[in-house]
């Protein structure tokens, strides 16, 4: 039977499927969050950088008023790159917007520091238009702030996002608290097997974002995806979302359309033959140098991902 939740390295349970809120438009997020929680979603993934946490908070409030209990859901937010040396301040901003006393998981959004005193709260730039990066920042120092905020009770878990094996290898020897989660872009055209395997070895749970690739992604019509969908009588979307849960990862499905939000809760068991088809597809892309990463902000930094190094 397909998993509905996974146990983190701190003993807490994280749902297998969550609602993602990245790039969800203003005016649509509140209803999406409220509806999702009322039909059975248990995980809401957000971030300060997304600029819509006020609306996420309104959706949470509406769902709570309709009978959803705070203790039954799992809320994720992320510290943006201009706040990596001001973690408490960054978290407090998110908590105010969300209308919560705590989140269940706080992530480092990217292991980079953008100038906290720059010309923009989120995306400071230099006169030449490049991102205003603080080059001597050590992400291990930022993690120490994450560990400190964990002790305040304002978050139940801490983790990272967009961390490569290289960056985790730099972090782990200095970590008192091992990250509970690494949230990464993940789909059959970017399986990131190296980091997935490394995280499993270290007890770090994977959360997959952009599981369909991107809007209009060729993944939806890729031969193995279509073949499995036809065999099982399900949609290509269901195949791609189920791929992650069958790998032991939590998957974030993003939509503001009620019918799609509901459909994205459907996760099915994929057998060994199905997974082999998808893995062979990934391996073929890798052998041809055609792996596709859709999310890579222009920080000008090598984060250590093999497909970008």
Swiss-Prot record:
It is an enzyme of class 1 (oxidoreductase). NADP(+) binds at residues 210-264. PROSITE patterns: ALDOKETO_REDUCTASE_2 (PS00062), ALDOKETO_REDUCTASE_3 (PS00063). Its EC number is 1.1.1.365. Keywords: Carbohydrate metabolism, NADP, Oxidoreductase. The active site is at 50 (proton donor). GO terms for biological process: D-galacturonate catabolic process. The keyword NADP applies. Pathway: Carbohydrate acid metabolism. Substrate binds at residue 109. It catalyses: L-galactonate + NADP(+) = aldehydo-D-galacturonate + NADPH + H(+). It comes from the Eukaryota. One of its GO terms (molecular function) is oxidoreductase activity, acting on the CH-OH group of donors, NAD or NADP as acceptor. Belongs to the aldo/keto reductase family. Mediates the reduction of D-galacturonate to L-galactonate, the first step in D-galacturonate catabolic process. Also has activity with D-glucuronate and DL-glyceraldehyde. No activity is observed with D-glucose, D-fructose, D-xylose, D-galactose, L-arabinose or D-mannose. Activity is seen only with NADPH and not with NADH. This is D-galacturonate reductase. It comes from Hypocrea jecorina. The gene is gar1.
